[in-house]
């Protein structure tokens, strides 16, 4: 495909189904469900909050990262990935589509396993570029790049432990 085009309605529906499964699996911490909706390799650009880009992360590594106790696997962390109704879709090849989605992601971390006391809140507002790939006839979640425009509360502290384990150190040097 030489020039990106608008995908057909059925392909958009397939991508929306993958997007829904991705968001729900994150929020319910259902890692088997996540495994069913992802592509064999993913582009994960978490520079917005982990300062890390994985150009081609194998699905098993992605599942390990997502379910890590320092990341979304922490049972004291509750999330809600809201995807806005205003989305843009571009078909970049026969088996690849890029979606641009409005996002709000709420995070709440609890002080105890009984989830009785909120220790930290942090919500991110913005958009996400999400890549989809058709694998054996089914559209799959193939990567994400969040774009955080603004945040509420202590969003920068939600994944502090995850940034230490999974991310890259921040550099004050100019990359000019």
Swiss-Prot record:
It comes from the Eukaryota. One of its GO terms (biological process) is melanin metabolic process. Secalonic acids show unprecedented anticancer activities against various human cancer cells and might be interesting for further derivatization, targeting diseases such as cancer. It is an enzyme of class 4 (lyase). One of its GO terms (molecular function) is scytalone dehydratase activity. The keyword Lyase applies. Pathway: Secondary metabolite biosynthesis. The keyword Phosphoprotein does not apply. InterPro entries: NTF2-like_dom_sf, Scytalone_dehydratase, Scytalone_dh. Substrate binds at residues 26, 46. The active site is at 81, 107. Keywords: Lyase. Its EC number is 4.2.1.-. It holds the Pfam family Scytalone_dh. Belongs to the scytalone dehydratase family. Scytalone dehydratase-like protein; part of the gene cluster that mediates the biosynthesis of the tetrahydroxanthone dimer secalonic acid D. The pathway begins with the synthesis of atrochrysone thioester by the polyketide synthase AacuL. The atrochrysone carboxyl ACP thioesterase AacuM then breaks the thioester bond and releases the atrochrysone carboxylic acid from AacuL. Atrochrysone carboxylic acid is decarboxylated by the decarboxylase AacuI, and oxidized by the anthrone oxygenase AacuG to yield emodin. Emodin is then reduced to emodin hydroquinone by a yet unidentified oxidoreductase. This is Scytalone dehydratase-like protein AacuK. It comes from Aspergillus aculeatus (strain ATCC 16872 / CBS 172.66 / WB 5094). The lineage of its organism: Eukaryota, Fungi, Dikarya, Ascomycota, Pezizomycotina.
């Amino acid at each position: 495909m030489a020039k990106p085009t608008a995908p057909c309605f059925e392909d958009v529906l397939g991508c929306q189904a993958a997007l829904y499964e991705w968001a729900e699996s994150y929020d319910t911490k259902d890692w088997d469900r996540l495994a069913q909706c992802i592509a064999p390799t993913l582009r994960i650009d978490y520079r917005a909050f982990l300062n890390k880009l994985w150009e081609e992360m194998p699905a098993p590594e992605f599942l390990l990262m997502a379910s890590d106790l320092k990341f979304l696997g922490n049972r004291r962390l509750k999330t809600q990935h809201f995807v806005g109704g205003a989305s843009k879709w571009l078909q970049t090849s026969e088996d690849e589509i890029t979606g641009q989605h409005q996002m709000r992601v709420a995070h709440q971390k609890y002080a105890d396993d009984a989830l009785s006391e909120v220790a930290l809140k942090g919500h991110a507002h913005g958009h996400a570029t999400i890549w989809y790939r058709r694998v054996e006839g089914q559209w799959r979640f193939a990567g994400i790049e969040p774009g955080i425009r603004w945040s509420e509360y202590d969003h920068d502290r939600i994944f502090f432990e995850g940034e230490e384990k999974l991310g890259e150190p921040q550099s004050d040097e100019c990359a000019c």
